[in-house]
C-alpha cells in the first residue's frame, strides 16, 4: 500500500470530538478510520520513515488535504496516541490537497445504450459510468511525487503542482463564473441545459464577451 485516495463528499472531512473511539471497529468517520490505519501501519513498520503513504483527498472543500490532516491530528490527540506516532503521521506521510474537475452524471440506465456500449467495448462492465470529455486533476505535492503516481504514463490530464490555489481560482472564475453569468437570462429565454445554450449565438456571444472583459483580466 502506497497511495490512499479519498472522495467522501464535503461532509466526509469532519471531526467531532468523541464520535469515534480508538478501539471501535470500525471508527465512525473517515478521518478516524484513516488515523487508525496509519497507527497500525506505524506500529507494523516500527515507525520507519519510508513507510508513509501518499494521501490524495478529493473532497470538494478548500485545502481538503490539510483539513483531513487536521482531523487526523485531532483524533490522535483524543486517543492519547504517543508523540512519536503523531510526528510520523505528519512527516512520513504526504497529505495532498487536490482539485478535481469533471462532471460524472451517473451510470447508464438505458438497457439499449448499455448493450451498444458493451458490444463496442467487447466486454461487460457492471460499473460502467458516464463522464464528460473534459477532466483535470490538480494535486498539490512535493517534488518527486509525480514519479510515484502512474497518471503521466497513462496519458491522463493530471498535474502535480506546488500550490493548487491558482488552479482553483481559474476554475471558479472561468467555468463557474461563465455558468453563473448566463444561466438566469438563458433560463428565462427557455433554455434548460448548457449544451443548448452554447448552440445559441446570442448566449454564447454574451458569455465570451463576459469572460474576456470581466473574468480573464482578473486571473
Question: Which residues does each PLM region occupy?
Answer:
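Substrate/ligand-engaging "lid" and interaction regions
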Residues: 1-216
